[in-house]
Amino acid sequence: MKYLIAGLGNIGKEYEKTRHNAGFEILDTFAKASNIAFITKRYGDIAEVKYKGRTFILLKPSTYMNLSGNAVNYWLQAEHIPQDKLLVVLDDLALPSGTVRIKGKGSDGGHNGLKHINQILGNSNYARLRFGIGNDFPQGYQMEYVLAKWTKTEYESLIPHFETAVETVKSFALAGIEKTMNTYNRKN
């Protein structure tokens, strides 16, 4: 069974290890732990991970955050993956740093990547894993905050949380959304 795991972020060296690229970091953690490299293909970087009878197509869109729907839709079609096997991994300002939350569907929560995916797919009926990046910034500085790089200390402290997010992704495919929500939404 195939699953499309779309990690949201922005391409380019200047965006590496920024808070807004938490989705990319989580997919990088998954691929690295599986000894799999990403390959540049249409609309993004792709890695295919096989785990316990499941195939995970990891997608890091090259469309920039605000046009993520184009890449997600293309790869759903190209791999013949139904929307209920889609999991979008993204950063979330509303959650404390390192917190992992998964749910089966919902609003875009003001996230431009989700807004575009909803627009292109025509609905919001897909799972999403939100990774908390906190909101420790002065009023009016949200953009600067999300596009800022984590400090070395912050990043190192988040590595176990990236690993928890990867375990949550695996559970989504192995145990289903409900059991995964019950297990991982309570952990942190």
Where are the regions that the model predicts?
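Nucleotide and nucleotide-moiety/phosphate-recognizing core
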Residues: 1-104, 115-129, 136-141, 148, ...
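Hydrophobic alpha-helical segments within soluble ligand-binding/sensing domains
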Residues: 110-113
